[in-house]
Amino acid sequence: MANPHQIYRHDAAWDRQVFRSLATSLILHGHIKTTLDRAKRLRSVVEKIITKAKKNDLAARRQILSFLYAQKTKAGIKVMPYLFNKVAPRYQERNGGYTRIVRIPSRLGDNSKMAIIELV
């Protein structure tokens, strides 16, 4: 039987790139629509990032910067200041559970299970 926890058959670099992109988008936009399996894996990535951001020290900033894409959105919002000034203070009193996964109907093309992952 195949390993049920091994979701993707790609190499580690591909996984890292996809989850860097998804995590950056989730932090900037507050919610994204993706497949259910990706949402479940993304949850642990984002929870660790927000927990590190709550510390708000130089080491935490460098660790997060090494993972997230330091990009601007079309509205001109940068990821790092937004994470440390808006997102992390919102969860200062919360001990985990920063994200919510909501299942939505399957995708029409290939019937993949879809979900919306959002920051609580």
From Swiss-Prot:
InterPro entries with a match to the protein in the record: Ribosomal_bL17, Ribosomal_bL17_CS, Ribosomal_bL17_sf
Pfam hit, one: Ribosomal_L17
A GO term from the CC aspect: cytosolic large ribosomal subunit
PROSITE patterns attached to this UniProt entry: RIBOSOMAL_L17
UniProt GO MF annotations: structural constituent of ribosome
Keyword Ribosomal protein: yes
HAMAP family in alphabetical order: Ribosomal_bL17
Binding partners and assembly: Part of the 50S ribosomal subunit. Contacts protein L32.
Family under the similarity heading: Belongs to the bacterial ribosomal protein bL17 family.
Protein name: Large ribosomal subunit protein bL17
Species name: Mesomycoplasma hyopneumoniae (strain 232)
Highest classification ranks of the organism: Bacteria, Bacillati, Mycoplasmatota, Mycoplasmoidales, Metamycoplasmataceae
